[in-house]
Regions:
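Fe-S-dependent hydro-lyases/dehydratases of central metabolism
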Residues: 1-197
Length: 197
């Protein structure tokens, strides 16, 4: 059968650390993230299969590397996630273990989808973008979950235990609650189970 369960994210940890699995340029579209061809979109109800095509137009080794990495981060330039509002463009990276995207800027709708699937979207400046490389180890030094709950905007990231930079989270109170829960699906599930008595 070609239908699988939608992935439900885990509640956000205090720590986010992982390898930069892919460094991308400006204007990466949702079509780059999940190609919109019929032979691929036929799997849109099977996230395990669909995720195999994640970012294949940028790097066809990405999905396999991400699955074996046990978590990681993406780095991008300006306007990450522009184009159509395809939820799968956030759902598939989440399934592959992506915990954060560090980008110079985000397309608004895709950024909302990153929140909805529990992926932390952090804005970085051009200098940080130029300096960070694919394969680097990135740690969000700030205790992530408590900082999000407290409404913090600035987060310190450490790269290769060598240098640090500041990244910024621009999020509403509702988006912060969704992130903390591990995504909209888990938040909704928690709310329903909590109200069920």
């Amino acid at each position: 059968p070609n239908i699988g369960e939608a992935p439900i994210g885990e509640p956000l940890d205090a720590e986010i650390e992982g390898e930069v699995l892919l460094k991308m340029t400006d204007n990466i579209t949702t079509d780059h993230i999940i190609p919109a061809t019929s032979d691929i979109l036929m799997y849109r109800s099977n996230i395990r299969k669909l995720s195999e095509f994640t970012l294949s137009r940028v790097d066809d080794t990405f999905a396999e590397r991400a699955l074996h990495a046990d978590g990681g981060v993406l780095v991008a330039g300006e306007n990450y996630g522009q184009g159509s509002s395809r939820e799968h463009a956030a759902m598939c990276p989440q399934f592959l273990g992506i915990e954060a995207v560090l980008a110079q800027s985000f397309a608004r709708i895709h950024k909302a989808n990153l929140f909805n699937f529990g992926i932390l979207p952090l804005a970085i400046d051009e200098e940080t973008y130029e300096r960070i490389e694919q394969g680097d180890d990135v740690e969000v030094v700030t205790d992530v979950a408590p900082a999000i709950a407290a409404g913090e905007r600035e987060f310190t990231i450490r790269v290769n235990d060598d240098w640090e930079a500041t990244a910024e989270l621009d999020a509403s109170e509702r988006e912060r609650r969704i992130l903390e829960a591990g995504g909209k699906l888990r938040l909704t599930k928690e709310q329903y189970s909590g109200s069920g008595g």
